[in-house]
Amino acid sequence: MSFMLATIKTASGPRAAMVVGDRVLDIAAASGHAEDATMLHIMETWAETLPRLDALATKAATSGIPLSEAHLLAPILNPGGIFCAGSNYGDHAAEMAARSGQPAPPDPHTLGLRSWHFMKTRHCIIGPGATVTMQPRSKKIDWEIELALIIGKTARNVSEADALDYVAGYLIANDLSARDLGNREGLPATSSFKADWIAHKNWDGSCPLGPWITLARDIPNPHDLKMVLDVNGVVKQDSNSSHMIFNINEQIADLSRNFTLHPGDLILTGTPAGVGAGRGEFLNKGDVVRLRIDHLGELVNTMA
């Protein structure tokens, strides 16, 4: 029986849960394994825990609480790392280059380049339905729909051919960005102090995740998922994960050549065209941002 993994708010704190249809089951309470209370532990013991979860799924369908009554948090609250692919859709790379009057960059494969990533911290994570506090120093907060994946077993120097074997599941992410804080004013482009990726990509609430983790085995093809983001009901991004420059296999292989990926780590695989920076539009207080990806549900947050 298919199920999704979530983290819910309870009187005793955040608890890992499974979603089966319109029911939600506290995994640790149902399994009798207290350590199953956190999503990180479930990922760290994924191979051993998955059969137990499969056995619980039938129980979840007839017990637990209604999904409508569950308070969903971000599916994982404390990943060891959040690695975000930069400029990984050709149309997005082109729209960002056009901002400064530059031509669309060539496919980096033709230059012998590999994927590149920056990082967000877990302090930035919020869940579905949560309110995003605007970065007070920024007037140009932007949206970015991203297909995210969660690692389910330790990965080091893995091959592209085997890379998907290390993915436990997929979820939706919004890589919120403060476009006017990414480069420090008054400094030449060649200055070592020009770029500020922390201010650009990291503040409390800048990494909405959710609504849950859909298991990798339930995704027919992660490289063919429709992705749509709208702001106040107006579609801004409408694309497909098939348009990635560096696919998921390449990204996992590239990252694992540099360091060990651990269970619970997240990889955000890039955003397509349609971001606010390319339109000269940015988010305002009260805006409702809705993200949808095939098979993964929808992630909705309000700006404040």
Which positions does each model-derived feature cover?
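N-terminal non-catalytic cap/leader segment that marks the start of a structured domain
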Residues: 1-115, 228, 288-292
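A generic local secondary-structure boundary/capping motif
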Residues: 6, 72-74, 105-108, 132-141, ...
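Catalytic-pocket segment enriched in acidic/His residues
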Residues: 11-14, 51-54, 65-71, 75, ...
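Short coil/turn connectors at secondary-structure junctions
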Residues: 13-14, 78-80, 112-115, 121, ...
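Short catalytic-site patches enriched in acidic/histidine residues
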Residues: 99, 116-135, 155-156, 205-214, ...
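Flexible glycine-rich active-site/ligand-binding loops centered on an Asp-His dyad
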Residues: 103, 109-113, 117-120, 163-191, ...
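Non-heme Fe(II) oxygenase catalytic core, chiefly the N-lobe of the double-stranded beta-helix
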Residues: 120-179
